[in-house]
Swiss-Prot record:
Native source species: Emericella nidulans (strain FGSC A4 / ATCC 38163 / CBS 112.46 / NRRL 194 / M139)
Cofactors that this protein relies on: FAD
This protein's name: FAD-dependent monooxygenase aptC
Gene symbol of the encoding locus: aptC
Upper classification of the organism: Eukaryota, Fungi, Dikarya, Ascomycota, Pezizomycotina
Residues that, per the record, bind FAD: E32, A43, R117, D332, G345
Keywords: FAD, Flavoprotein, Monooxygenase, Oxidoreductase, Signal
Up-regulation conditions: Expression is induced during late sexual development in the dark.
Gene ablation phenotype (knockout): Fails to produce asperthecin.
UniProt key word Flavoprotein: yes
């Protein structure tokens, strides 16, 4: 009996890989440290090159099958449209307004992350094609390519005492990858000198229609730019009675004495709202709708997190050495990029598509053929992913430019129109 592929992590890259392997009748098991109830209810932006590739890989599904399942506003007939206009977050004035995209052929759309993960997991080709996900399995050890009765196998050991053997181990466990830490301890995430504060809150549908709709219309995001800082308001999920939303306050660090930047902050400290943050935001004199939610009184009622911005890059020699030991990386485990301005979710999905495609061709052949297939996966994805990490760092600063530069860009666009 063929040993399964062991996939560590039930995020976008892990579930995409597992779904496509399962559809191809390649046995695999996904191990997730969190319980089934874990939530990642915020929304992400999906690019056309990412969601179109996924739809093709799943059997040329129509775009509507995706948007009806994952759009933050799906329950009220929306399709995840986002207005890509940039507004001055003090005056509300539109600085730049690209043409509105059509529902039939968008270049970008918003997706609720929880709903997207569930949709990928459920996108099987038949009733017997359910993904095998084992929750509550936190990886603590790996044994790589030992000789056994079934040939070369990898072994994964978990904190609950469970042990599984497989033909291949896929590291899909994110920026804090346990797999990477165990076998490539010298590769550590880089913390960027930027700050990103994120607040979650809820509105009633009546409040949403009254205070957000006049500014956002049908858009699931209201992008606000200031003088070197950003304050987007985003819709995460809409029901008949409640709207889940979040705000982000982000800017580059202002040096060694920045009271809001602490690269050594603990997870518990990251949940505390610093008074310096409230003072700084109040001093910005934001206009509506941002001022309604980014103010001291409102923020104290929200769940607020200080998100450290981490990036991960690896050398080709690192991944090559792991391939020979039966390990392959997908998603943020080997190319993490900033949440703000990055496209990590899209690249995670694309990794899963590319790897599954290569493994499907080589499956059932020799170990050398499988390793050659993994090499082709890296050949195809290496430049894409490394360039994306580099661009994402640059993009953060481009999106946090002085307001005078935003206005100058807008004026030049008007002259060219």
């Amino acid at each position: 009996m063929t040993l399964p592929v062991l996939i560590i992590g039930a995020g976008l890259s892990g579930l995409t890989t597992a779904r496509l392997l399962t559809n191809a009748h390649i046995p695999c098991i996904v191990f997730e440290a969190s319980p089934p109830s874990r939530t990642q209810g915020y929304a992400i932006s999906l690019r056309d090159w990412g969601f179109n590739a996924l739809l093709r890989a799943l059997g040329n599904l129509p775009l509507s099958s995706l948007t009806r399942a994952v759009a933050p506003d799906r329950h009220i007939g929306g399709w995840g449209w986002l207005d890509q206009s940039w507004r001055n977050n003090q005056t509300g004035e539109i600085i730049m307004m690209p043409p509105k995209e059509s529902k039939e052929k968008p270049t970008i759309l918003r997706a609720n992350r929880n709903a997207l993960r569930q949709w990928i997991a459920d996108a099987g080709v038949g009733e017997d094609e359910e993904i095998d996900v084992r929750y509550g399995h936190r990886l603590v050890g790996v044994q790589l390519l030992r000789e056994g009765g079934d040939g070369n196998v990898v072994t994964a050991e978990f904190a609950n005492g469970a042990t599984y053997t497989g033909s291949l181990l896929i590291a899909a466990d994110g920026v804090h990858s346990t797999v990477r830490t165990l076998i490539l301890p010298a590769v550590k995430p880089e913390i960027l000198p930027v700050l990103v504060y994120h607040g979650d809150f809820k509105l009633s549908r009546e409040e949403y229609e009254c205070v957000i709709r006049p500014h956002a219309g049908e858009s699931t995001i209201v992008a606000g730019v200031g003088d070197g800082f950003n304050t987007p308001l985003t819709v995460c999920d809409v029901t008949s009675t409640t709207v889940h939303m979040d705000w982000t306050y982000s800017r580059p660090s202002i040096g060694d004495n920045d009271p809001l930047y602490n690269p050594n902050i603990t997870s518990e400290e990251a949940k505390v709202i610093p008074e310096a943050l409230i003072e700084e935001i109040n001093a910005k004199k934001l206009g509506e709708p941002w001022s309604l939610f980014l103010n001291g009184e409102a923020m104290r009622r929200h769940r607020v997190f200080n998100w450290l911005t981490r990036c991960v890059s690896m050398e080709r020699s690192d991944v090559n050495s792991c391939t020979g030991k039966g390990v392959v990386f997908v998603g943020d485990s080997w190319h993490a990029m900033p949440i703000f301005g990055g496209e990590g979710g899209n690249h995670a999905i694309f990794d899963g598509i590319e790897l599954a495609k290569m493994l499907e061709v080589a499956w059932g052949r020799s170990k050398e053929d499988v390793q050659a297939a993994i090499g082709k996966y890296y050949d195809k994805s290496w430049r894409r992913c490394n360039d994306a990490v580099r661009r994402s760092k640059q993009r953060f600063y481009q999106l946090h430019r002085p307001i005078s530069e935003w206005i100058e860009i807008a004026e030049k666009q008007k002259m060219r129109a």
